[in-house]
Regions:
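General structural feature for long, well-ordered alpha-helical segments within catalytic domains
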Residues: 1, 25, 62, 66, ...
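Conserved C-terminal alpha-helix-loop-beta "cap" of PLP-dependent enzymes
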Residues: 116-126, 130-183
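Conserved PLP-enzyme active-site core in the AAT-like
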Residues: 1-101, 105, 114, 118-122
Length: 183
C-alpha cells in the first residue's frame, strides 16, 4: 500500500494511527513503509496497565516536528509529563505481548460465536488479525445497547453500570461501549 501511495505522490507522508494494532504482526508500520506511527499506551503497548501516555515513532524529522508541536516550545522530546507513572508504563510494556495475544485469542473466540449467531463479524475467525478489534452488525441500536449492557453486567469491574449511548468528541453518532476492565 505504501508503494502505491508513493507512486502516486513521491512527497506523501504516510501516517498510521496504530492504536490496537501493536504486537499483532511480526512487523510494525514503519517497517513496511509508514513514515510515522502513533499509538496509545493505555491500549496494546501498555498491556492494560498504563493509565496514560502515547508514543510517536518513525522518521526523525517527523518525530521532532510532532514533539515540538505537542510539547512546550523548546522542550521537544527531551522533557515531558509522566504523571509519576513510569513504573506502570514499563510494566505495561513487559506484559503487552501476552495481553495482546490473549486479546486476539478472545477476539477469535468471539468471532466464532458471532458467526454461529449469524452476525458476520469482521474480521472472521479464520482471517489475518491486524488489530484486536472485531466489528459486527447488531441489527438495531437496541440490540447493540443490550449487547453492551450484557457484557458490562458479566464483567468483574463496574458490573452494576448500564451503558447508554451518548455524544463522544470526534464522532458524529452517539457512542455506547462496555468495559469490565481496570484501565
Amino acid at each position: 500500500m505504501a508503494d502505491t501511495a508513493r507512486a502516486a505522490n513521491p512527497d506523501i507522508i504516510i501516517f498510521v494511527d496504530n492504536c490496537y494494532g501493536e504486537f499483532t504482526q511480526t512487523q510494525e508500520p514503519c517497517q513496511v513503509g509508514a513514515d510515522i506511527a502513533v499509538g496509545s499506551l493505555i491500549k496494546n503497548p501498555g498491556g492494560g496497565i498504563a493509565p496514560t501516555g502515547g508514543y510517536i515513532a518513525g522518521r526523525k524529522d517527523l518525530v521532532e516536528l510532532c514533539a515540538y508541536r505537542l510539547n512546550a516550545p523548546g522542550l521537544g522530546k527531551d522533557l515531558g509529563c509522566t504523571l509519576e507513572t513510569p513504573r506502570d508504563m514499563y510494566l505495561g510494556f513487559y506484559y503487552a505481548p501476552g495481553v495482546v495475544c490473549e486479546a486476539i485469542k478472545t477476539a477469535i473466540y468471539a468471532q466464532c460465536m458471532l458467526e454461529l449467531l449469524g452476525k458476520n463479524p469482521v474480521p472472521r475467525y479464520c482471517d489475518d488479525h491486524n488489530d484486536i478489534v472485531t466489528c459486527f452488525d447488531a441489527g438495531t441500536a437496541d440490540a447493540l445497547i443490550g449487547f453492551c449492557q450484557g457484557i458490562q453486567a458479566a464483567s468483574p469491574v463496574d458490573s452494576y453500570a448500564a451503558p447508554e449511548p451518548s455524544p463522544e468528541p470526534g464522532y458524529t453518532d452517539e457512542v455506547v461501549m462496555a468495559s469490565g476492565s481496570f484501565t
